[in-house]
């Protein structure tokens, strides 16, 4: 009976360890999935992780946030906010975090409070640099304007993510 309980605990630990290991990239050991941005003005998106694979399309927006969903050697499988993606060489990606505004005329507040002074308004689709994030708000910088916006109005940051 005791041997069975010990075996059950060991199996549970192994399963938990295996599932934890799947949350990290096999190449970089960074969290998976994770957000990055497009470093280059253009980035070829390929069907597979090599130069021999066909280019399906080209990302053409520098600083566009992308979500890394897989790693293979020097290649990262990414997707954009519309779910489109493929394999991109890691040299075209940056760890600098950006987000896309998902709400038209999004107000940036001076503090993470809807009653705070309004600093600016951003149109839908604007790319902003991501700063610190609390439980509900993130600090953004876009076109020289700074302020706080609610996380649910942004693509490129997880709702549970906290950044300092």
Regions found by a protein language model. Name each.
Residues 1-9:
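Bacterial N-terminal signal peptides that target proteins for export
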Residues 21-47, 58-62, 69-84, 88-112, ...:
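SH3-family beta-barrel domains
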Residues 50:
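Intrinsically disordered, low-complexity polar regions and short flexible loop motifs
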């Amino acid at each position: 009976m005791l041997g069975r309980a010990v075996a059950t605990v060991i199996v549970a630990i192994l399963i938990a360890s295996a599932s934890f290991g799947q949350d990290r990239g096999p190449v970089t050991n960074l969290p998976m999935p994770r957000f990055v941005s497009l470093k280059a003005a253009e980035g070829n998106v390929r069907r597979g992780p090599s130069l021999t694979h066909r280019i399906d399309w080209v990302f053409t927006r520098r600083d566009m946030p992308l979500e890394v969903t897989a790693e293979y050697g020097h290649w990262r499988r990414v997707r954009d906010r519309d779910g489109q993606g493929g394999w991109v060489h890691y040299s075209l990606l940056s760890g600098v975090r950006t987000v896309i505004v998902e709400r038209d005329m999004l107000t940036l507040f001076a503090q993470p409070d809807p009653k705070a002074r309004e600093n600016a308004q951003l149109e839908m689709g604007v790319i902003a640099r991501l700063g610190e994030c609390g439980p509900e708000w993130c600090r953004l910088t876009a076109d020289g304007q700074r302020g706080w916006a609610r996380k649910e109005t942004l693509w490129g940051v997880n709702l549970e993510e906290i950044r300092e």
